[in-house]
Amino acid sequence: MPRSLKKGPFIDHHLLSKVEAAAEKNDRRPIKTWSRRSMILPNMVGLTLAVHNGRQHVPVLVNEEMVGHKLGEFAVTRLYRGHVADKKAKR
């Protein structure tokens, strides 16, 4: 179920202050964040956010299509290496 419209989008206060400061200074360095639950807002477009995936920070360049999604959707946490092939089937 989506979030109620009367509540508005959720974004951590510390991340919002970093985004506003970077937009004010036209700073292009990545903003490190552990807040995967924060929603992408229109004032984040054009910024690079380094989102933590549990092991490292993944750089995410925000564009217009990402607005309204959560940051965690763009930093994959699970690595799929494929199914193990059967040795008999290879011959």
Swiss-Prot record:
Tagged with keyword Cytoplasm: no
UniProt cross-references to InterPro entries, sorted A to Z: Ribosomal_uS19 (IPR002222), Ribosomal_uS19_bac-type (IPR005732), Ribosomal_uS19_CS (IPR020934), Ribosomal_uS19_SF (IPR023575)
Origin: domain of life: Bacteria
Molecular function via GO: rRNA binding; structural constituent of ribosome
Keyword tRNA-binding in annotation: no
GO cellular component, one term: small ribosomal subunit
Keywords noted in UniProt: Ribonucleoprotein, Ribosomal protein, RNA-binding, rRNA-binding
GO biological-process terms attached to the record: ribosomal small subunit assembly; translation
Primary role: Protein S19 forms a complex with S13 that binds strongly to the 16S ribosomal RNA.
Protein family (similarity comment): Belongs to the universal ribosomal protein uS19 family.
Designated name of the protein: Small ribosomal subunit protein uS19
Organism: Saccharophagus degradans (strain 2-40 / ATCC 43961 / DSM 17024)
Classification lineage: Bacteria, Pseudomonadati, Pseudomonadota, Gammaproteobacteria, Cellvibrionales
Chain's gene name: rpsS
